[in-house]
Amino acid sequence: MGRTRTKKTKQVKPTTAPSSTSSAPEPSIEALFDKAQELLIQCNYDLAHRFVQRILERDSTNAEAREMSAVIDLERGEVENARQIFLSLVPPSSTAPNPPPHSAYLYLAQLSDGPHEALGHYKAAVDLVVNRVNTGATMSEDDKSELKKTAAKALVAMIEIWMSDLCMEPEAESQCDSLLALAHSTDAGNAEVLQAEASIRMSQSRPEDAQRSVSAAWTTWRDLPPGDPKIPDGETRLQLAKLMLELGLNADALEIIAGVVSEDDQDVEAWYLEGWCLWGMAERVKAGEKLEGGNDEKGKEKQEASDDDLGWEELARDARDCLETCKMLHIGQEHADKPMLVHVEELLAQLDTLGIKPSSEQGDENDGEEWVDDEDDVEMS
């Protein structure tokens, strides 16, 4: 009988309680804020809120954290909670910092129940921003530029209120003109301000002045390379394209819309405007009209090429392709703008009446045709 092997027991090292000096340090408020901001960008609102709450547990007066908490509430649909937090950040609240954040006023303007209340909040924001620019001796030029853009955007929002909700007020026109002058002096050459100017001039039945403003707005970013931060966002560019369509500058509008589509091919409104623009061009070419391409040399050259290259049927077919894409995306995304879908279907019905088929169907028909070789054709003749 062999020797039995003794079982070896594994030695277990005694555990000692970690000393207080080896525990991980508490993250700084700045680190917590950066993490909350990162989560907010990722749309992880619940986790972002937890990080903000950790900041407020350590510093309940932290204005940035309170504002971010309100922004998170907005994203989660808790609008009234957000409103109350924003109100706590501005006078006459006893918990408002000095000076209050201009961004809180901008949010309150968008959450306002009436136009006059919104105007008051926008004005407060503009006053704060302009004061910061004028007194910020040590502020960098980039920071000043961003603040000027913020003030100009708020002034444009005020102009839009006077042109829509308060358009029947006797002082509406004078208010628009004074706000426009202030916007120009605050941020000269701002594209959105120039677009607002074009809208005002159109409402005043001054189309030539409106066209000059539209051209000036486009000039501010037209030749910039794609992705340049100075190029306005897609929504602003589509607003400019709409103004161009109202002025009959379809070719220029088409160039702007195509740029937006190339950046975001899921943008329902961009496809709608591109289809509508092309359909308008098709109608005018069919009627024997020359299309307007702007007053500069680029516009004239581009328009001459467009007139030579495309007949009305080709333009109409391109319009149909865009409108079909718009309809598909509108339904797929459950887009909120129902009148847009109604108009798209009306335009498609008109194209049906004219016998304009989508490019895919037209291509299928061409594939079924019998091709005749040029040499055979010559021999037969």
Language-model features: locations:
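Flexible helix-coil transition and linker loops at the boundaries of alpha-helical arrays
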Residues: S20-S22, D59, S88-P101, L128-A151, ...
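Short coil/linker segments at helix-helix boundaries
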Residues: T95-Q110, E117-S174, G280, R284-C326
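Amphipathic alpha-helical repeat scaffolds of TPR domains
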Residues: P27-F33, N98-H116, E146-C167, A188-S199, ...
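Alpha-helical segment of the N-proximal tetratricopeptide repeat
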Residues: P27-R54, E75, V156-M168, E246
